[in-house]
């Protein structure tokens, strides 16, 4: 009579902003499923996935915080290079990421639309976007997940 539910949290759960992947296939009764989801919802969102997607879900949400931290560190290094104190750079960049993510979540807009809203013709932002594209940012994101999935 042991019941099993696989739940995969990520580190942002420590500040109540986590992602809890909840495997759809389980041995729980419906009432137990609801109670466990409510329990984990206290530390973030609960997303139910079929068993065959738990691996990729974990790769994206479980490993992703390290990649975001690397992104923060890289942009902070650039800010420091141009004179911004490191702690200020971390705070500014982290808040920018938090705000951008919240904007996408609350509006439901496609990330490309939100990006385009910031890019003026011949402006600084589109020049930075072009540089990131030339450097293979999207490809690097995909390859990082490929490396995890092929481990």
Where are these regions (language model features)?
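Rossmann-fold dehydrogenase core element
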Residues: 1-11
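Short pre-catalytic strand/loop immediately N-terminal to key active-site residues, enriched for Gly-Thr
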Residues: 4, 54-59, 111-116
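Short beta-strand segments
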Residues: 6-8, 23, 119
């Amino acid at each position: 009579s042991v019941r099993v539910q696989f739940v995969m949290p990520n580190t942002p759960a420590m500040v109540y902003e986590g992602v809890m992947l909840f495997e759809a296939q389980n041995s729980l009764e419906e009432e137990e499923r609801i109670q466990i989801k409510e329990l984990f919802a206290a530390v973030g969102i609960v997303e139910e996935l079929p068993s065959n997607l738990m691996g990729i879900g974990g790769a994206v949400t479980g490993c992703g915080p390290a990649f975001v931290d690397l992104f923060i560190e890289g942009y902070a290094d650039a800010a420091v290079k141009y004179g911004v104190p490191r702690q200020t750079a971390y705070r500014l960049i982290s808040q920018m990421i938090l705000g951008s993510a919240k904007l996408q979540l609350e509006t439901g807009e496609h990330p490309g639309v939100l990006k385009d809203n910031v890019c003026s013709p011949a402006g600084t932002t589109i020049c930075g976007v072009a540089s990131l594209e030339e450097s293979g940012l999207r490809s690097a994101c995909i390859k990082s997940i490929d490396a995890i999935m092929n481990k």
